[in-house]
């Protein structure tokens, strides 16, 4: 009788509740490389015990089977905090530690560092993995991790960075720049973050500041709603950034009309210039109309500039960088 090419639909639930012997009985009815799950990987991509993995390898399963998204079992588990023990088991059982995935050809080491799997990183080093291997874009695992690090990622990244730097991985200017960017984003949104996680996040940030030689990002000073709004910068681009930091909250609407003018102009610029209007909908058009109403309030632009601004708003979706810069300047 021919064996099935796919794993049972409930295989993931099965491996979490059934014994290894029961799992073997189920797998005995399947081809050794039968695939399943969202990624259509073979059985090694599921949360099996090390003993079960060893048995499958002895039966001839492909330890480096590539699923429909380009992941080997090791790459798949390396990218999940809860799968670290499976990833370590696969390294010990001989999985290819040089396998890559994605358009940027990230290695297992890249994935493990980015995920914050410290014990897996140590295991990979012991197995001979290169801690300074570069992706297609030329980034080392530590550079790649800081490139994508946001808010709480720094908590899990701090001990990994300490370990890698401790064994000689260099701290590059890229890493410092990425760390600075992540820290600035955290300080901008600090008020909106859960206070329960902040002590741990602050400890991680202080550790990384010292470890990487990055100056601490100062706490954000927000507008109190009543004081005069004072601008210190001279160029309009710098003025917009200064007002953004002062008036725009980490999330939601600003508390003042001035803040809404800065917030909306910034959101429109990002959607048009950075996203090429891929998310454009009636909400963005409404924001553009609201921006024009706000501009006409208080101390409005002179008549000529109001007409110019109205023209820019009417053609906002088709605006180019020059148009957006002029709108933001006004």
Question: What name fits each language-model region?
Answer:
Residues 84-90, 96-102, 106-110, 114-116:
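Eukaryotic tandem repeat interaction scaffolds
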Residues 49, 82-86, 119, 152-157:
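Coil-to-helix interface segments in alpha-helical RNA-associated scaffolds
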Residues 4-12, 34-46, 66-79, 100-108, ...:
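Ankyrin-repeat boundary/"N-cap" motif
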Residues 105-139:
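Internal alpha-helical scaffold/solenoid segments in large eukaryotic proteins
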Residues 102-107, 133-330:
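Ankyrin repeat (ANK) tandem arrays and their immediately adjacent linkers/low-complexity segments
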Residues 18, 48-51, 81-82, 116, ...:
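Ankyrin-repeat intra-repeat helix-capping/turn positions
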Residues 24-31, 54-63, 88-97, 122-130, ...:
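Ankyrin repeat domain, specifically the short helix-to-loop turn at the C-terminus of the second helix
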Residues 2-46, 51-56, 61:
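N-terminal segments that cap or nucleate solenoid repeat domains
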């Amino acid at each position: 009788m021919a064996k099935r090419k796919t794993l049972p639909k409930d295989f993931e639930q099965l491996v979490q509740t059934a014994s290894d012997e029961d799992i073997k009985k189920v797998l005995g009815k399947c081809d050794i490389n039968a695939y399943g799950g969202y990624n259509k990987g073979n059985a090694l991509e599921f949360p099996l015990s090390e003993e079960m993995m060893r048995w499958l390898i002895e039966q001839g399963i492909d330890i480096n089977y590539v699923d429909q998204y380009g992941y080997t079992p090791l790459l798949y588990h390396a990218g999940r905090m809860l799968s670290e023990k499976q990833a370590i088991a696969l390294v010990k059982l001989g999985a290819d530690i040089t396998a890559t995935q994605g358009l940027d050809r990230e290695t297992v080491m890249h994935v493990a560092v980015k995920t914050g799997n410290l014990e897996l990183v140590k295991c990979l080093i012991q197995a001979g993995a290169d801690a300074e291997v570069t992706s297609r874009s030329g980034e080392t695992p530590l550079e790649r991790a800081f490139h994508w690090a946001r808010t709480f990622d720094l908590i899990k990244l701090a001990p990994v960075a300490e370990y890698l730097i401790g064994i000689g991985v260099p701290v590059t200017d890229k890493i410092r720049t990425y760390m600075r960017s992540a820290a600035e984003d955290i300080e901008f949104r600090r008020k909106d973050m859960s206070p329960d996680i902040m002590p741990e996040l602050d400890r991680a940030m202080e550790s990384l500041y010292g470890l990487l030689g990055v100056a601490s990002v100062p706490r954000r000073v927000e507008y109190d709603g009543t004081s005069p709004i004072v601008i210190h910068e001279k160029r309009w681009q710098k003025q917009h950034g200064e007002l953004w930091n002062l008036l725009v909250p980490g999330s939601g609407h600003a508390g003042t009309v001035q803040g809404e003018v800065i917030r909306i102009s910034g959101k429109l610029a990002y959607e048009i210039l950075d996203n090429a209007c891929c998310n454009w909908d009636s909400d963005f058009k409404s924001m553009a109309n609201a921006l024009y109403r706000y501009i006409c309030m208080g101390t409005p632009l002179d008549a000529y500039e109001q007409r110019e601004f109205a023209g820019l708003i009417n053609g906002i979706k088709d605006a180019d960088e020059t148009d957006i810069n002029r709108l933001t300047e006004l």
